[in-house]
A protein has these predicted regions:
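Membrane-embedded translocation segments of transport machinery
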Residues: 2, 6-36, 217, 221-437, ...
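Membrane-interface "cap" regions at the ends of multi-pass membrane proteins
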Residues: 2-57, 86-91, 101, 114, ...
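Juxtamembrane transmembrane-helix boundary signature
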Residues: 39, 44-45, 51, 73-109, ...
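Transmembrane helix-boundary motif of multi-pass solute transporters/channels
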Residues: 41-77, 88, 213-219, 286-294, ...
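Hydrophobic, membrane-embedded alpha-helices of multi-pass small-molecule transporters
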Residues: 44-54, 126, 131, 168, ...
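Transmembrane helix-loop boundary segments of multi-pass membrane transporters
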Residues: 60-78, 109-110, 218-227, 270, ...
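A generic transmembrane alpha-helix motif of multi-pass inner-membrane proteins
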Residues: 130, 472-474, 484-507, 527-627, ...
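Extracellular/lumenal N-termini and interhelical loops of multi-pass eukaryotic membrane proteins
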Residues: 131-190, 248-262, 329-405, 499, ...
C-alpha cells in the first residue's frame, strides 16, 4: 500500500514529490541554525512574547476610559488591519531568510541594516526597564508570605503613639508602594540613592532571565510551558473568585457599557491602534528571530492569525477579570464611605443603631437638608457615588501595585491571592523578556562585533550583565520617574518608525511580488487580496497616522511627570511637575538615536561603498550580499586610518 505524502502545507505537492525530497529540502534549508523541538514551543513562545503586562494593566484602562464596549470596535478593526498584517510580515521574512533582525534586513538590502540595529537598540532599552518591573513584582511576591499583608495597614510611628503620618494622610497601599518599595523622591533631580532591596530583586530578575535564556530556544522553549500557560490558569482562578465577590458584576457591566459617542473621538481610534501595535510586540526583532527557527515550510500565515486571535481574546479576558476585582473594590469603598457617613449621622443626632440603613440613607439626607440645613452643612459628609469609585481606573504600575493590592487585602486568605497575582505578573513579564533578549542577542551575533567562537551562553550573559548594570538607575529613589521616561519614549516613536520602514522595505524595496513568491514557496499559495492591500497601503498608512499624531501631540505639549510629594499642598494627590531642561537630551537618546540609526547606517554604507571600496582587496570580498547590490567600482582612497575605519564589515 502506498502511503500518501503528508506535506507541511497544501499546495506544495507539485514541488515536493516524495518524503525523501521533503527531508532533503528541510535539511538544506535548516543548515546549522537551531530549530524548535515542536510547534507548541514556538507558538507558546510567541504568545508569551506578545501577551505581556500591557494586556493586563493597559487594555482594561483603555476600555474603561474610551467608552467601554465601544472601544472594542476600533480595537478589533485595527487588530485586523494593522496587527495581523505586520505580524504575518515579520513571521514570513524571518522564516524565509532564517536570520535575526539584522541578518534579515541585510539580506533584503545592505542599506537596510540600520532597521535591524534600531530594533536591537529598542529591545535593549525596553528590556532594561521592563525587567525592573519584574524586580518590583518579585519584591511584592516575597512580601506576600505574611499575614496580614504588609500593605494592609499603616505602620506605627517611632514614638509608638500613632501611625506614620505619611501613611495616615494617604493609604497603606500607597505608603507601601511609594515609601517602603520605591522610597520615592519628590523630584527626578534628587536620585535618593540606591535602594538595596530593589537592587537585590533586580539582580534576581536578571539572573533568572539569564538562566532561562542560557542556550536560546533550547532553554526558553522549555520554560514557556510554564510561563506562557500559568497566567491563563491564574486569570481563570481570579475570575471564578472575582465573580463570587460582592460588586464584581457591577465592575464588568461598567467596563462594557458602551458609549458610542466615543467612536467619533479620534483619540479613541489612535489609542486603539497604539494598543494593537504594542500588544503584538512588533518591530522589536524578537518575532523575526523566533520565526527563523521554524521549518521553511511552516504555515506562517496561519500562525499569525492564531496568535493574533489569542492576543485579542486575552486582552478582553484580562479586562473582565481585572474589572470584576475593581467592581469588588469599588463596592467595598462605597460601603465604607456609606457606613462612615451613617456613623457620623448617628453620633451627631444621637440616633439608635439601625435607624439609618442603605435603603433609607438618601431620603434621610434630604430630610436633614430641609429641616436642619445649617447642621447638615457642618457635617461635611463624604460623597459616596458608586460610579465615581468605579471610574477611578488606573493603568500600569498603579493598577498592579495599588488598586489590585488594595482589593486583595479585602479578600479572605489575602496572602494566597497576593502570591497568585504576582506569580501571574512574573510569568507574563518573564515570557515577554525572552523575546527582548532574543531581539538583542541574535542581532549582536549577526553583526560580528564580538568573537564568533563565543557560545550563546556568553552572549546572553553579557547582555544581561550590561543591562543589569545600566538598570541600576531604576533602583534609585527617583527610579520610577526614570522608568516612566523610558516607557514613554524608548518604546514609542522608534518602534513606529521601525515598523513603517519594515513594511515599506518589503513592499517597495524587496518587492511585493518577490515577497509573494517567497510565501508561495513556503506555504504553497500566494497571499490573497487582503494581505496585498494591507501590506502595500493600509497598514503603513495606519502606522504613519499614529506616528504623526503621537509626534504632534508630544511636541506641542509641555513634558511633565507625576510625582509623589508628601510636602505638597494637595497630598496625597500625585503632583504634576515639569521635567528639567537637561532631560530633553535623554529623550533624544531614547527616541532619536534608534530612529536616526536607520538613515545613518545607510549613509555610512553609501559613503564607504562609493568612495572607500577597493574591489580587488580581499578584505572587502564579502562586503555585499549579492551581485545585485554590489556597488560599481570606485576609486580607492589610500590612507591607513581611513582604510581601517571603513573596512569593518559588521554592517
Amino acid at each position: 500500500m502506498k502511503l500518501k505524502l503528508k506535506l507541511p502545507n497544501p499546495g506544495l505537492d507539485e514541488r515536493i514529490p516524495s518524503h525523501a525530497e521533503l527531508e532533503k529540502l528541510e535539511l538544506e534549508e535548516a543548515g546549522e541554525r537551531p530549530q524548535w523541538d515542536n510547534k507548541a514551543q514556538y507558538m507558546l513562545t510567541c504568545v508569551g512574547f506578545c501577551v505581556g503586562l500591557g494586556n493586563v494593566w493597559r487594555f482594561p484602562y483603555l476600555c474603561q476610559s474610551h467608552g467601554g464596549g465601544a472601544f472594542m470596535i476600533p480595537f478589533l478593526i485595527l487588530l485586523v488591519l494593522e496587527g495581523i498584517p505586520l505580524l504575518h510580515l515579520e513571521f514570513a521574512i524571518g522564516q524565509r531568510l532564517r536570520k535575526g533582525s539584522v541578518g534579515v534586513w541585510r539580506s533584503i538590502n545592505p542599506y537596510l541594516v540600520g532597521v535591524g540595529i534600531a530594533s536591537m537598540l529598542v529591545s535593549f532599552m525596553v528590556g532594561m526597564y521592563y525587567n525592573t518591573i519584574i524586580a518590583w513584582v518579585l519584591w511584592y511576591f516575597f512580601n506576600s508570605f505574611q499575614d496580614p499583608l504588609p500593605w494592609s495597614q499603616c505602620p506605627v510611628n517611632e514614638n509608638r503613639t500613632g501611625f506614620v503620618s505619611e501613611c495616615e494622610d494617604s493609604s497603606p497601599v500607597d505608603y507601601f508602594w511609594y515609601r517602603k518599595t520605591l522610597n520615592t523622591t519628590p523630584v527626578i533631580e534628587d536620585s535618593g540613592g540606591l535602594q538595596w532591596w530593589i537592587v537585590l530583586c533586580l539582580f534576581c530578575a536578571w539572573t533568572l532571565l539569564w538562566v532561562c535564556c542560557l542556550r536560546g530556544i533550547e532553554t526558553t522553549g522549555k520554560a514557556v510551558y510554564v510561563t506562557s500557560t500559568l497566567p491563563y490558569l491564574v486569570l481563570t482562578i481570579f475570575l471564578i473568585r472575582g465573580l463570587t465577590l460582592k460588586g464584581s458584576v457591577s465592575g464588568i457591566k461598567f467596563l462594557f457599557t458602551p458609549d458610542l459617542d466615543e467612536l467619533l473621538n479620534p483619540s479613541t481610534w489612535l489609542d486603539a491602534g497604539a494598543q494593537v501595535f504594542y500588544s503584538f510586540s512588533l518591530a522589536f526583532g524578537g518575532l523575526i528571530s523566533f520565526s527563523s527557527y521554524n521549518s521553511v515550510h511552516n504555515n506562517c500565515e496561519q500562525d499569525a492569525v492564531i496568535i493574533s486571535i489569542i492576543n485579542g481574546l486575552t486582552s478582553i479576558y484580562a479586562a473582565i477579570v481585572i474589572y470584576s476585582i475593581i467592581g469588588f473594590r469599588a463596592t467595598e469603598r462605597f460601603d465604607d464611605c456609606l457606613n462612615g457617613n451613617i456613623l457620623t449621622l448617628m453620633n451627631t443626632f444621637d440616633l439608635p443603631e439601625g435607624n439609618i440603613t442603605e435603603s433609607n440613607y438618601d431620603g434621610f439626607l434630604q430630610h436633614l437638608n430641609s429641616t436642619v440645613p445649617a447642621v447638615f452643612q457642618d457635617l461635611q459628609l463624604k460623597t459616596c457615588d458608586m460610579q465615581t469609585f468605579l471610574s477611578q481606573g488606573v493603568e500600569g504600575t498603579g493598577l498592579a501595585f495599588i488598586v489590585f493590592t488594595e482589593a486583595i487585602t479585602k479578600m479572605p486568605i489575602s496572602p494566597l491571592w497576593s502570591v497568585l497575582f504576582f506569580i501571574m505578573l512574573f510569568c507574563l513579564g518573564l515570557s515577554t523578556m525572552f523575546g527582548s533578549v532574543e531581539g538583542v542577542v541574535v542581532p549582536l551575533q549577526d553583526l560580528n562585533i564580538l568573537p564568533k567562537r563565543w557560545p550563546k551562553e556568553v552572549y546572553t550573559g553579557l547582555v544581561c550583565l550590561v543591562s543589569f548594570g545600566l538598570a541600576i538607575i531604576f533602583a534609585q529613589g527617583s527610579g520610577e520617574y526614570w522608568l516612566a521616561l523610558f516607557d514613554g519614549f524608548a518604546g514609542s516613536i522608534p518602534l513606529l518608525i521601525i515598523a513603517f520602514c519594515e513594511m515599506m522595505a518589503v513592499a517597495y524595496i524587496y518587492g511585493i511580488d518577490r515577497f509573494n513568491d517567497d510565501i508561495k514557496f513556503m506555504i504553497g499559495h500566494k497571499p490573497n487580496f487582503f494581505w496585498q492591500a494591507t501590506w502595500r497601503l493600509v497598514s503603513p498608512l495606519i502606522v504613519l497616522l499614529i506616528f504623526l499624531f503621537y509626534f504632534v501631540t508630544t511636541v506641542s505639549k509641555e513634558l511633565t511627570y507625576i510625582a509623589w510629594d508628601p510636602q505638597s499642598e494637595n497630598f496625597p494627590t500625585l503632583e504634576t511637575k515639569s521635567y528639567p531642561d537637561w532631560i530633553y537630551a535623554i529623550i533624544f537618546i531614547l527616541s532619536g538615536v534608534p530612529a536616526l540609526v536607520i538613515p545613518a547606517v545607510a549613509l555610512y554604507k553609501l559613503i564607504r561603498n562609493r568612495y572607500f571600496f577597493a574591489p580587488s582587496d580581499s578584505r572587502f570580498s564579502n562586503s555585499c550580499i549579492s551581485d545585485k547590490y554590489c556597488p560599481p567600482n570606485k576609486p580607492y582612497i589610500n590612507g591607513e586610518m581611513i582604510y581601517y575605519l571603513f573596512s569593518f564589515n559588521f554592517l
